[in-house]
C-alpha cells in the first residue's frame, strides 16, 4: 500500500470520527431539553436555588433520603433568619456529585448538614455519569462544578445521552414520568411533597434487598477523607458543617447492636461534628413509604421535628420545640397475602436450565440475586405493566446476562423508574415469541 493510499485512509477515518463527534454534540447540546420533567430534572432547580439565595442558609446535602425526609417549611418556622435549601437528590447519582455541585456556592454563615443514606455506595466516591447528564440537560453550565476525576465518566456516557435525546425527539415524546418520581413532585425548597404518601407500601414493611449495616467496612476510607476535606474547605469560607444520620427503617437493620460502636468510629474519623443521637435515626417501619430510607408524610414530620431539636442543641438554644406530632400510621403489612408475593432464588430454581423465566403480575418484589444460579437464562419476562408495583434492588441481575422484557408501552416507564432505571440498558419490549 503506497503512502498516498495510507494518507487517504487516515484522512477518511479522521473525517468519520470527527463527523461522529459533531453528530453527538449536536444531539446532546443542540436538541431541545428532554429530561427536564424527570426526577433527575429537579437537580438544576436545586442548584439554581443554592446559587441564587443570599444571606444565611441551612443547606441539606445527601441523597433522596434528604429530599423525602425533611420538611423545609417547618424548619423555616423555627429558623426564620435562615433560608432553607434542600440539596438532597438521588443515591444512584452518588453522594460525591451533590457535595461537589454545592461546594462553590456555600458561603459564610451557612449551616451545612451532610446526611447520606447508610450504605456502601453512598459512603464511597461512586459517581453516575448517565444520571448526571440527565440532570444537566438544559443547564449544562453546572457541569463546570464537577471535579476532574469524573470527566471520564461524563465523556463515556455522553454518546448514550445524546442518542437518547435524539430518540425521544424523533418519537415526538419526552421520557415518561411515573408516580412521585418526577420533577413536579418537588416544592420550591427542594423537598418532595408527600401529601398522598401516608403509609408504608412495602410488602414486608421493609425492602428486603436493602439491608442496612452499621459497620466500619460500609465506609470507603478514601471517602471518609473526602468528606473531611470537603468540610474543611467549607469551614474556611465561614460555614458550619455537621453530619447527621439519615432515617433508617428499623426492620432493615441487620444488627442494631452494631450502632453504638459504629457511632464511636464515625465521630472519631470525621473532623466535623455528628449531631443528634444515632438511636433517633432508627424509626419504626410504619413511618416509611417505599424504601428503607424514604419516610411517608407523617414520618417526615416526626423526623423534621427531631432535626430541629438536634440543630437547636448544637446552637445552644434550649427552648422547647413544641409541635403536635402526627399519629403513627397503621400497619399495612403482615403475612404476604396469596394474591401478592415476593420472588426469590427458590422460585427461580424451578426454571433451572430454561432460557426464559416469566414473572407473574402479582409479584410485588424480586429479591437480589434471584437469578444468579440460572445457567443459560436469556430472558426475564415481566407481566407487570406498572414498574412502581414491583420493587427491585441493586443486585437483580448479578450472576446472569439475561435481558429484562416488559409489556408493550411500558419500556420507557421501566427505564425511568426509580428502582428499575439502573437496568435501563438491559430492558426491552416483550414479543409474542418471548412470551411463549
Task: Outline where the language-model segments fall.
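N-terminal Sec-pathway targeting helices
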Residues: 1-17
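Membrane/wall-proximal cationic-aromatic binding patches
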Residues: 16, 20-81, 92-96, 100
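Membrane-embedded segments
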Residues: 61, 65-146
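Secreted/periplasmic serine-hydrolase-like ester/acetyl group-modifying domain
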Residues: 129-237, 324-330
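Active-site segments of SGNH/GDSL-like serine hydrolases
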Residues: 228-255
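C-terminal regions of proteins
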Residues: 256-330
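Structural signature of tandem-repeat unit edges
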Residues: 334-343, 351-365, 374-390, 400-410, ...
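Consensus positions within tandem repeat domains that build extended binding/scaffold surfaces
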Residues: 367-370, 393-396
Amino acid at each position: 500500500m503506497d503512502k498516498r493510499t495510507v494518507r487517504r485512509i487516515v484522512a477518511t477515518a479522521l473525517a468519520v470520527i470527527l463527523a461522529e463527534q459533531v453528530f453527538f454534540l449536536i444531539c446532546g447540546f443542540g436538541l431541545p431539553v428532554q429530561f427536564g420533567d424527570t426526577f433527575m430534572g429537579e437537580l438544576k432547580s436545586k442548584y439554581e436555588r443554592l446559587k441564587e439565595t443570599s444571606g444565611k442558609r441551612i443547606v441539606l446535602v445527601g441523597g433522596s433520603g434528604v429530599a423525602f425526609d425533611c420538611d423545609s417549611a417547618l424548619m423555616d418556622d423555627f429558623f426564620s433568619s435562615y433560608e432553607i435549601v434542600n440539596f438532597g437528590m438521588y443515591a444512584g447519582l452518588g453522594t460525591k456529585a451533590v457535595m461537589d455541585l454545592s461546594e462553590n456556592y456555600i458561603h459564610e454563615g451557612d449551616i451545612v448538614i451532610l446526611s447520606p443514606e447508610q450504605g456502601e455506595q453512598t459512603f464511597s466516591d461512586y459517581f453516575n455519569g448517565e444520571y448526571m447528564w440527565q440532570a444537566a440537560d438544559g443547564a449544562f453550565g453546572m457541569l463546570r462544578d464537577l471535579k476532574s476525576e469524573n470527566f471520564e465518566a461524563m465523556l463515556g456516557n455522553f454518546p448514550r445521552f445524546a442518542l437518547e435525546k435524539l430518540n425521544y425527539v424523533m418519537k415526538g415524546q419526552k421520557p415518561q414520568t411515573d408516580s412521585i418520581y418526577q420533577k413536579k413532585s418537588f416544592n420550591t425548597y427542594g423537598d418532595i411533597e408527600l401529601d398522598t404518601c401516608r403509609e408504608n407500601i412495602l410488602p414486608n414493611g421493609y425492602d428486603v434487598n436493602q439491608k442496612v449495616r452499621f459497620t466500619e467496612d460500609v465506609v470507603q476510607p478514601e471517602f471518609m477523607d473526602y468528606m473531611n476535606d470537603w468540610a474543611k474547605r467549607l469551614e474556611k469560607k465561614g460555614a458550619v458543617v455537621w453530619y447527621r444520620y439519615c432515617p433508617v427503617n428499623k426492620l432493615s437493620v441487620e444488627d442494631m447492636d452494631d450502632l453504638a460502636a459504629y457511632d464511636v468510629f464515625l465521630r472519631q474519623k470525621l473532623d466535623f461534628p455528628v449531631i443528634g443521637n444515632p438511636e433517633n435515626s432508627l424509626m419504626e417501619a410504619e413511618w416509611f413509604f417505599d424504601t428503607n430510607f424514604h419516610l411517608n408524610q407523617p414520618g417526615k414530620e416526626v423526623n423534621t421535628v427531631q432535626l430541629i431539636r438536634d440543630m437547636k442543641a448544637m446552637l445552644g438554644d434550649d427552648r422547647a420545640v413544641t409541635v403536635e406530632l402526627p399519629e403513627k400510621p397503621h400497619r399495612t403489612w403482615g403475612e404476604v397475602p396469596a394474591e401478592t408475593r415476593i420472588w426469590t432464588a427458590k422460585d427461580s430454581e424451578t426454571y433451572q436450565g430454561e432460557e426464559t423465566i416469566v414473572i407473574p403480575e402479582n409479584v410485588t418484589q424480586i429479591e437480589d440475586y434471584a437469578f444468579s444460579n440460572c445457567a443459560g437464562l436469556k430472558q426475564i419476562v415481566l407481566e407487570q405493566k406498572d414498574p412502581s408495583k414491583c420493587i427491585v434492588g441493586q443486585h437483580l441481575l448479578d450472576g446472569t446476562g439475561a435481558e429484562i422484557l416488559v409489556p408493550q408501552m411500558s419500556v420507557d416507564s421501566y427505564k425511568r423508574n426509580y428502582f428499575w432505571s439502573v437496568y435501563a440498558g438491559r430492558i426491552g419490549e416483550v414479543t409474542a415469541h418471548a412470551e411463549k
